[in-house]
């Protein structure tokens, strides 16, 4: 019995280590790209118009229609897109079929939206849990990453404002 408990405990620790990486005390369900060059933005299809990303901060939200926390984030992402429209482009990327995303009526997405059923960028980032957000500066460097509602590490308007002020060209 003790062997089984030890094996289960070791398996849980291994799984936890595999699924999350520490980032200044923040748990990530992805590989950390903080202060590193962001991978190339890859999408299969734009549901919205394609944004002009030149000289902009880019907030990318990996999400799905079935994900409760992802849907909870949409109104706040809408607000970020409005509040920081001069400096920030918000993009939601789902790996679901375009029809599935278009069927979702509430909440309404008011920012740029794209589909990548192959999850190319999501795989490059090693994302294993959603929602997962990265904020990229105009030079292509990741300046914020993670689960936007993680206690003590929330992505807020103040956080975005501070990053824009710090890393704006």
Please give the residue ranges for each predicted region:
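Sec-dependent N-terminal signal peptides
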Residues: 4-13
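A short beta-strand-turn-helix
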Residues: 33-58
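Thiol/disulfide oxidoreductase modules built on the thioredoxin-like
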Residues: 103-109, 116-163
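C-type cytochrome heme c attachment motif
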Residues: 65-72, 132
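Structural microenvironment flanking redox-active thiols in thiol-disulfide oxidoreductases
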Residues: 71-109, 117-124
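Short pre-active-site segment immediately N-terminal to redox-active cysteine/selenocysteine motifs
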Residues: 56-58, 62-66, 97, 129
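Structural recognition of the beta-strand scaffold that forms the well-ordered cores
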Residues: 58-61, 89-93, 112-114, 135
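N-proximal helix/coil linker or "cap" segments that precede and/or mark the start of modular domains
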Residues: 17-40, 169
């Amino acid at each position: 019995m003790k062997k089984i408990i030890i094996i289960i405990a070791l398996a849980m620790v291994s799984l936890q280590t595999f699924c999350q990486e520490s980032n200044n005390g923040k748990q990530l369900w992805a590989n950390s790209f903080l202060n590193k060059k962001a991978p190339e933005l890859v999408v299969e299809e734009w549901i919205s118009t394609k944004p002009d990303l030149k000289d902009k901060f880019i907030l990318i939200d990996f999400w799905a229609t079935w994900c409760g926390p992802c849907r909870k984030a949409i109104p706040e992402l809408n607000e970020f897109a409005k509040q920081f429209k001069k400096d920030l482009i918000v993009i939601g990327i789902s790996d679901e079929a375009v029809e599935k995303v278009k069927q979702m009526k509430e909440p309404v997405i008011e920012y740029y939206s794209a589909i990548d059923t192959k999850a190319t960028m999501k795989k490059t980032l090693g994302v294993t849990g959603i929602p997962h957000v990265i904020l990229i500066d105009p030079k292509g460097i990741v300046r914020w990453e993670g689960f936007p509602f993680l206690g003590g590490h929330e992505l807020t308007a103040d956080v975005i404002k501070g990053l824009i002020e710090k890393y704006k060209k």
